Amino acid sequence: MNDAINHTACETLFTQARTHNGWLDKPVSDAQLQAIWDLMKMGPTSANCSPARIVFVRSAEGKEKLGPTLSSGNLQKTMQAPVTAIVAWDRAFYDRLPTLFPHGDARSWFTSSPQLAEETAFRNSSLQAAYLIFACRALGLDTGPMSGFDREKVDAAFFADNGWKSNLLVNIGYGDPGKLYGRLPRLSFDEACLLA
């Protein structure tokens, strides 16, 4: 049985963490990006399928490719962010299953059903995007996840050679608290949950 994390850790991960739109001029290192991956990869996925693939965009060239794919409301904050993670999914994720899930022939579950493969990859890469956000928060970084972009343009710009498919974007860095909006409300337990 696991011990509950303390209140401060819960604040860091959930109740005091915010989605940032403005960023301080402070870099994110290669070592930090590696640490993010090393945490997020440990989160559970269906049959350990681990379909997420990440492109950490931070160079001027990378930002130049990403810019035209963004909705107008996401352009400035993304260009300012030290890093933007493109969370994508690998259409051929199942080719890694003999290593990742050696308990049976899991690869055949997906090669025999392209629809199941796509649904599994998209669902589990979305789950892994959440792990990325919480890994960033655990490591003292802030995030700004976004879905306002043209997926086809991102795929053409970044994934023409490997067939990956973009899911969502996450800006990463040190957020500027002066550019935060007031915290928006959340649904109560009674509004969002049922007991069965």
Swiss-Prot record:
Family from the record: Belongs to the nitroreductase family. HadB/RutE subfamily.
Domain of life the protein comes from: Bacteria
Gene3D superfamilies: NADH Oxidase (3.40.109.10)
Entry keyword annotation includes Flavoprotein: yes
A GO biological-process term: uracil catabolic process
Keywords of the record: Flavoprotein, FMN, NAD, NADP, Oxidoreductase
Function: May reduce toxic product malonic semialdehyde to 3-hydroxypropionic acid, which is excreted.
Protein name (database record): Probable malonic semialdehyde reductase RutE
Reactions catalysed according to its record: 3-hydroxypropanoate + NADP(+) = 3-oxopropanoate + NADPH + H(+)
CDD domains per record: RutE-like
Enzyme class: oxidoreductase
Gene Ontology MF annotations: 3-hydroxypropionate dehydrogenase (NADP+) activity
InterPro entries associated with the record: Nitroreductase, Nitroreductase-like, Nitroreductase_HadB/RutE, RutE-like
Source organism of the structure: Klebsiella pneumoniae (strain 342)
Gene (UniProt): rutE
Co-factor(s): FMN
S-S pairs: none
Enzyme Commission number(s): 1.1.1.298
